[in-house]
Amino acid sequence: MVPISTRSEVQDGLIAQARSLITRIVHNSDDVYGFGTLSCTVYDTAWVALVTKHVNGIKHWLFPESFHYILASQCDDGTWCEDKTAQFDGVLNTIAGLLVLKRYRRDPLQLKVDNRDLDSRIKLATSALHSLLEEWDVSTTNNVGFEIIVPTMLDLLVQEDPSLSFELKGREALTEIREAKMNRFQPELLYQGKLMTLTHSLEALLGRIDYDNVARYTVKGSMFASPSSTAAYLMSASTWDDEAETYLRYTITASTGKGSGGVPGVFPTTYFEYTWILSTLFRAGFQSSELDSPELTAMTDTLLKAFKAFSGAIGLDSGIEPDVDDSAKIVTTLNMLGKPAHARYLCDNFEVETHFRVYPRERDPSFSANCNALAAFLHQPDVEVYSSQILKAASYLCERMWNADEKIDDKWNKSHLYSSFLYTQVMTDLMAITEAGRLDGVFTRELLTRVCVTIFQSCLRAMLKQSHDGSWNQSLEETAYAILHLTEARRLCFFEQISEPLENSIYRGITFLTTIDKPPMEYLWSDKVSYGSAYLAETYVLAARRAAESTSVTNLVGSSIWKDNASTKMHKLVGLFHRTPLLKALPKWELQASMIEASIYQGLLQDARLEVLQRPKVDGGEYLSIIPFTWTSCSNSARTNASASHLWELMALSFFTYQVDEFMEAVAGPAFKGRMTHLHAIIDEAVHCSQNRERTPGECENTNHVTSELLQAVRFILDNPTVRKASPYDRNTLLQELRIFLHAHVTQVEDNASFGRERLTGDKALTSYRSQLYRWVHTISSDHIAGPFCFYYATCLLGATLTAHPPNDCFPKSSQKYLAAATCRHLSCMCRMYNDIGSWNRDHREGNLNCLHFPEFSETTSDDAERKASLLTLAQYERKQWCNALQQLEKEMVHGASEPAAARLAKRRACLIDMFCKVTDLYGQIYVLRDVSSVIKDVVRNGE
């Protein structure tokens, strides 16, 4: 524990630093242009460098210092991209940089340039751009206006030099997005002021608009605070705009470039930075009384004046098009400052059917903007007035997080940790408000449970992704995001049992933050290209350090959904899982965390458990607790980060397979005793009816209870919304495997009955079975445990959601389909063998046919231990086979992709297939340790 005196000293130091930050902000704010600390971008600087002006009849480059900035910024490999992970930045910056080099090489005007140097640079840049465009994954790009900016920039290169025509693997996807936008574009609407957001990217409209008709939309000389858009306007309008020139000159000297020629992508950003900085500090625990100063008063007055002047609707700076992000942030910030600010404008101008939009006609909604909108509503004293808006925003956010594969993405910040901590903050606040009795009846228990699942997953996965040095991605700002994320987890009752590793994670993160003296600029924020802000980064670091110091939590959140009433049972299951070879190397707290996650899921699963098949003669087994745990533990242990929805679907599927097993043994088997051929026919009828949508329910669902139950079960699988989106091939394969799975259960009942008659002799050996062990375990036996059926259900989910052009086959090539089948079959055989080792005594007692009953074992030994050892050896053989097949499958999937998007998605599908295999493997390992099947009572097995 940190001594109280030391903690007080730390907090005093943080307060002093926060006050210093506020002072510097105000002192660097201009009365006319405002404030902005966003980093310079090569792309915008390139456009400024392209501006020419005639002075006394002579054409000059107007901003040669920007040309020199471009030269100084080029990397050794020819690109303009210091951060090699920022793929699109490299593409757009390099296109823009190359265009500048070509223009100045062709027409140096008043400058003396080294042509040999320029030629060398152009050659390097051209080669580098070929590679960048070859590797660019268009599907992952969501930068502002990229779909119209990139084609325009590539056209400008070709106009400059016809040889600069580049191949682009993602050109089809890019063209599709561009046409979707430009088909709706009408210049007249822009001239009428109805497409104001386009004034931020006027450079993309060269040749499409009359720039004289947009001149009146400048604000203090700028076009939507964009140097690149302003430069394009200045060089294209027929009348020179002195105010626009003055704006660009001021931006060069007063922005973060400080006269170097570099300019930011957006300048100024007064309201954006003021509200983000103040709201972040206050949320972390800083009090306005602690930061009270003339400078804080000045910032407050600026925001109050803006809120009143624009009726609560603001943009990133004065006069700029309002957006939901800045409008929501000013509401939250003013309320934190004790200045009441309503949120009505958010409803009137940004609310749409399912969410809150940032701007009119936006292509994709913003996750973080909806977090900020929800926060603004929750900061209202009369939250009930905004209950419908709160429900709408919360539902949208939860749905996005529930379906987010691996991580949540957002258009305004590239780090998923940013969106994750915003989500955790606002949803924890929402849970606290509902548990305090407010917003009564607004939210369903199901939605709140999903919120709890996603909050817990988000926080836990952040803990699991922490680097050994205490950082996240060796990034100061991202580490601050993560700490803000985890300090919020302190408020959640789910984290009580793992509070020690939680605090350790926070402590290690803080240690990393305090060891960095001069942090490099980080480009996590996104506009046309990525940018950063030293002031924003400093704010998040201060906020993280202050939040980490605020350890007292009075009322834990989440108790209405999660009750810690099964801790003893949980500890036993954690102990069981920790003994398995797959999980024994993990720290025990990780398994405890996976168990907590599973227990939250269990609340959802319990409601759905009996919806498919009724099984009145079955006592519930431990699988009700184990099923969710198998999926969460394997997802977390391998850091797979499967989406909450994917895990949910597979958990529900696992429940379904156990229900089928119990239904067949406890209901269908006894009902069709002596008439199993008829039961096989009913299965075919149920599958056929599910396929044939033209038949009426009355034609299919006769009075036979078993028939209607089986039909309901088949439709439960085939009518799944995601399954219905899968490719025809994947759906048909699933249908075949479902039919085989159900038939295998009937055959198993028949085999059990046949074996039951032999069992009366007291022998543990099977003498009359019609097949060898190998054939049985590779067909009926492995089909019976649902391995192939579940595998192809999972492939339907993956093909429908994670292919480049859904619905595509999960395994698009014949070699992949074959290797997938081999992986699945060998995996299922291994699991069946493990299962039979673990359930040998129960199976023999209850008359269930087991691998160990086959003559291959009885003819060599009668000792159970020796039989099990022999079967384990065979299981290990099957393990080698499926591991080898899976390895080959993964190679085929990744290397067989024809474009970057397909390769990325194939790699992700392979990762999730690997998780599926691990779960199946884990079930087998658990069976070896302990039989988890339910007890079937009062079942007669001696019929035919």
Swiss-Prot record:
SUPFAM superfamilies named in the record: Terpenoid cyclases/Protein prenyltransferases
Q: Where is this motif: DEXXE motif?
A: 661-665
Give me the reactions it catalyses. 9alpha-copalyl diphosphate + H2O = aphidicolan-16beta-ol + diphosphate; (2E,6E,10E)-geranylgeranyl diphosphate = 9alpha-copalyl diphosphate
Keyword annotations for this protein, in alphabetical order, are: Isomerase, Lyase, Magnesium, Metal-binding
EC number annotated for this UniProt entry: 4.2.3.42, 5.5.1.14
Q: Which Gene3D superfamilies does the entry mention?
A: 1.50.10.160, 1.50.10.20, Farnesyl Diphosphate Synthase (1.10.600.10)
- Binding residues annotated for Mg(2+) 3, in chain numbering: 835-836, 839, 843
- Residue interval(s) of motif DXDD motif: 323-326
Its cofactor is: Mg(2+)
Annotated Mg(2+) 2 binding sites? 661, 665
Q: Which sequence ranges form a coiled-coil region, renumbered to this chain?
A: none
Q: Its Gene Ontology biological processes?
A: diterpenoid biosynthetic process; geranylgeranyl diphosphate metabolic process; terpene biosynthetic process
Q: Which molecular-function annotations from GO does this UniProt entry contain?
A: aphidicolan-16 beta-ol synthase activity; magnesium ion binding; syn-copalyl diphosphate synthase activity; terpene synthase activity
Which residues hold Mg(2+) 1? Answer: 661, 665
The keyword Flavoprotein belongs to this UniProt entry's keyword annotation: no
Q: Which domain of life is it from?
A: Eukaryota
- Which pathway does the UniProt entry assign to this protein? Mycotoxin biosynthesis
Any additional notes? Part of a gene cluster that groups the genes involved in aphidicolin biosynthesis.
The record describes the protein's role as:
Aphidicolan-16-beta-ol synthase; part of the gene cluster that mediates the biosynthesis of aphidicolin, a specific inhibitor of eukaryotic DNA synthesis and DNA polymerase alpha. The geranylgeranyl pyrophosphate synthase GGS is required for supplying a sufficient amount of geranylgeranyl diphosphate (GGDP), the general precursor of diterpenes. The diterpene synthase ACS then catalyzes the conversion of geranylgeranyl diphosphate to aphidicolan-16-beta-ol via the intermediate syn-copalyldiphosphate (syn-CDP).
| Comment block on domains | The DXDD and DEXXE motifs are important for the catalytic activity.
Which protein family is named in the record? Belongs to the terpene synthase family.
Task: Please state what the protein is called.
Answer: Aphidicolan-16-beta-ol synthase
Supply the source organism for this entry: Neocamarosporium betae (Beet black rot fungus)
